[in-house]
């Protein structure tokens, strides 16, 4: 699966960014511009602004395995950064394939909490018929109306319109399959998310509506990771304040040996 964005040469330490749902790698555009790091890769999850491979079930384990395979292709250990479900796949990869990373950053550490509870949107998507009805309505709505949902959660207008414009049937079907595979994600992935050898950073936005700070903090402690609180920012922190997001990453990476 191709990276959407890439700069620099593969001889340098690579930073790999993984988006969430319903998103594309474009969520990282502003942050990467502010970061100005010489070698970055922003991956496109299968089925999200890219084709869904034949036979790909879009389950949480298949996506995590897919990410591990992408990192293997890069060769050397990477600085891995994930948001939303991308952050969840980071949780899984550093738990099962820690040799693939030099460091890791996630805003979805709660998926590695054995007591994790899903948010209301997830529960709809995990429910047969209700999930299909939700996405049927979204796909039938004008792009501007879909963008309004993102704006309700703090996304500025232009990136909200971009996010909304990329939602399609393939993406919706992948989201349904992903969430239905992950009803018990905390109990399945949580036990392995402990004492991760590579340095980690868990980002905790104060206005995050989909994952509790308590769950993220508890999971970070079990994984031996640091935490970074982002006051005043929400789920799409990298779109709300790209410069601040880049500064947090630079500060963390500066501590690595």
Labelled PLM ranges:
Residues 14-19:
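Short beta-strand element of the alpha/beta-hydrolase
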Residues 233-242, 246:
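Catalytic histidine-centered segment of alpha/beta-hydrolase-like enzymes
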Residues 2-13:
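Short beta-strand-to-loop junctions in surface cap/lid or active-site-entrance loops
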Residues 30-38:
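A short, Lys/Arg-enriched amphipathic alpha-helix followed by its capping loop at the start of a domain
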Residues 21-22, 26-27, 41, 46-79, ...:
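Flexible "cap/lid" subdomain of the alpha/beta-hydrolase fold that forms the substrate-access gate
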């Amino acid at each position: 699966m191709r990276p959407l964005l890439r700069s620099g040469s593969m001889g340098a330490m690579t930073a790999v960014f993984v988006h969430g749902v319903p998103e594309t790698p474009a969520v990282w555009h502003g942050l990467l511009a502010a970061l100005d790091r010489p070698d970055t890769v922003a991956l496109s999850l299968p089925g999200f602004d890219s084709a869904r491979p034949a036979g790909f079930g879009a389950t949480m384990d298949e996506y995590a395995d897919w990410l591990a395979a992408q990192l293997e292709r890069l060769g050397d250990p990477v600085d891995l950064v994930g948001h939303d479900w991308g952050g969840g796949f980071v949780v899984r990869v550093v738990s099962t394939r820690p040799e693939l990373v030099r460091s890791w950053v996630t805003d979805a550490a709660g998926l590695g909490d054995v007591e994790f509870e899903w948010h209301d949107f997830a529960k709809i998507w995990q429910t047969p018929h209700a999930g299909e009805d939700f996405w049927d309505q979204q796909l039938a709505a004008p792009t501007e109306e879909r963008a309004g949902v993102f704006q309700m959660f703090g996304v500025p207008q232009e990136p909200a319109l971009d996010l909304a414009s990329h939602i399609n049937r393939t993406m919706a079907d992948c989201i349904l399959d992903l969430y239905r595979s992950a009803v018990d994600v905390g109990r399945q992935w949580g036990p392995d998310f402990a004492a991760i050898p590579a340095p980690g950073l868990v980002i905790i936005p104060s206005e995050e509506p989909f994952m509790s700070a308590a769950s993220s903090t508890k999971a970070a402690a079990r994984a031996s990771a640091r935490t970074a609180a982002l006051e005043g920012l929400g789920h799409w922190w990298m779109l709300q304040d790209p410069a601040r997001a880049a500064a947090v990453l630079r500060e963390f990476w500066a501590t690595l040996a």
